[in-house]
Amino acid sequence: MVNKFTNLGFLIVITLILSQCANKGTTSGGDKDVTPPVIIKSTPENFSINFDAQEIEIEFDEYVKLKNLQKQLIISPPMTLEPEITPVGTASKIIKIKIFDTLQPNTTYAFNFGESIADNNEGNLFPYYKYIFSTGTYIDSLSVSGMVSDALNKEVDERVAVLLYEVDSSYYDSIVYKQKPKYITVTDSLSGFKLENLKEGSYLLTALKEENPNYTYQQKTDKIAYRKQFISVPSDTAYVLRLFKESIDYDFKRARQASKNKIAFGYEGEGTSMRIKILSEVPDDFSSTITKEIDKDTLNYWYRPEIEVDSLLFEVRHLESIDTAVVRIKDFKLDSLMFKPLSSKLKLQESLLISASTPLGKFKASKVQVMDKDSVFQTPTMGLDASLNAVVLDFDKTEKNNYSIQLLPGALTDFYGVENDTLNYKVATKLQSDYGNVRITIRNGVYPLIVQLTEAKGEEVESQMITEATPVDFKDVNPGIYSLRVIFDTNKNGVYDTGSFLNKTQPERVSYASKPVEIRAAWDTFEEFVLED
């Protein structure tokens, strides 16, 4: 009997232990912890003045971890020597900040941790915590706020850096390229910003969307926005900054032999003003032509006849800029003449373009035949598009038809006198009812205007310039949802012009209709866009 009671007691104890162990591991044994961590103390205290410490400790009531600190943490003013902040990759009850930089006198510093602090167990955020101190006798408390928009596109980049440069005796016009700002913040989810803990003074207000964040402007990769006039702090103004990508400054890079009788001239920026001249001695029958590579910042200089030399000397001009280039000449092969149609689906009023790998010289329409699916033949009209180095074929088309295009030998001749072999291509048209049309009426326009349909990311689909109050018709548009954009063409050149920080010019004004435009197949749509002042 005693043994039975002993065994029973042992089983009860074991059962209780196992039950407690099981409860510790269950996910249904109580409410989920949603309480964020709490700061117990900070050493030195937050909002300290006369700060001269080299290390800061922030102690929490539970273990915390730092997530995505490099992206989330904003230190304002920025430090030349980055501080060391722990824990990294592990959890701790204490966040430590070791300062290595020499702190500026009488300056308020702010460490904004964004959404980087979370408890270790449930990941509850301790959002937008700021540790603030002053090396002077008081904490600066002034602020500046506003919004950032994109000058051209409807959508605005996330986490745009907004910067203030103090305008004092050390300020200079190109400071944004070389020095970090006095104060920094980033835009919130609604593209708003607020720069806090500022001291009274005059400032340059800018914004940057950086490819590689370092708070200095890199023209090739970054977007910039700026306020043309300096701002004064304190200020009650809500500032609006329009972010834009500058046109890259022209820079000649290099010249190299790409193939026989072909020299490639690489550059950055605007290349339409480039002029290339050969300085080496050439024969009397020497001839040359230049084409631009599609989607590349390269001009190809083609010449004939072949010159038996070790090198060629060129002069490259661009407005007031003059460069010279020496190109070593090797025994390369001549480029083969090859062709590629730029589309296999054509609208009824659309031309067929066939691009060539070498410069086109002559064409013979009599050696080109077009046949539809009913074996009806026609001879197209032909032309050359120098910008694409392509032949342009125009012929009568009907809806829902297939066309076979044959170019017989000698239909096309390139710069070197090489003729095409027989070429065969097939293209097709769709039903007219597969497309939609839209008529757009602009109200309150200040002309000229460029009216555009764009896709979601701002890519241009249709575009038309108008110089007076007249409806804009976009016909045979693929069905879909589009945005309606109007560019105020201030300089009347028919294209959107971006801004320049150094030249102190802002990008041309752009307005988007508040509602998207839906293009439906076999449907005529009518839209009215009232422009605001």
Write out the residue ranges for each language-model feature:
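Acidic, low-complexity Ser/Thr/Gly/Pro-rich repeat segments typical of extracellular/periplasmic
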Residues: 2-5, 21-208, 220-226, 248-262, ...
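Sec-dependent signal peptide recognition
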Residues: 4-13
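Structured interaction patches on ligand/partner-binding surfaces of diverse proteins
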Residues: 127-128, 209-247, 325-337, 416, ...
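Intrinsically disordered, low-complexity terminal regions enriched in Ser/Thr/Pro/Gly
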Residues: 437-439
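Charged regulatory segments coupled to nucleotide-binding catalytic modules in large multidomain enzymes
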Residues: 445-446
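Short, surface-exposed loop/turn motifs with a glycine/proline- and acidic-biased composition
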Residues: 478-479
